[in-house]
Amino acid sequence: MHELSIAQSLLALIEDEMAKHGKEKLITVKVRHGRLSSVVPEALSMAFEVMTADSRLAGAALVMEETPVLLRCRDCSREFTPDPPTAAFAPCPGCGQELGHTVVSGRELYIEYLELE
């Protein structure tokens, strides 16, 4: 369950930002994760809740939003969402090429915003 280490990293980043801005309370953290990032949202949410339970971050809301996969064809440069949406080797709807696509989005994992007091 690598979500535990992801939660630890998120909490370290959150604590750094809180210190940087002189804030004492975390209200909400929004995390954006790509469909190909291998993050299990329920596991990350549970890890976040457990790790913040007895801290000043207890009760903070973790909002997660998934970014869909977007590929760019290496042959015709068309951008498309594969079907199924987790397929990295899908035929390009423009030219039919199946291999060598560039992942434009879908692998990211980052904090989009923090709501602090």
Curated annotation (Swiss-Prot):
Coiled-coil blocks: none
GO MF term list: nickel cation binding; zinc ion binding
> Which GO biological process categories is it annotated with?
protein maturation; protein modification process
InterPro entries linked to this entry: Hydgase_Ni_incorp_HypA/HybF_CS, HypA/HybF
Disulphide bridges, residue numbers: none
Residues annotated as binding Ni(2+) = 2
Q: Does the keyword Lipid metabolism apply?
A: no
Which residues bind Zn(2+) per the record? 73, 76, 92, 95
Q: What is the similarity comment for this entry? A: Belongs to the HypA/HybF family.
- Task of the protein: Involved in the maturation of [NiFe] hydrogenases. Required for nickel insertion into the metal center of the hydrogenase.
According to UniProt, the name of this protein is Hydrogenase maturation factor HypA
Gene that encodes it:
hypA
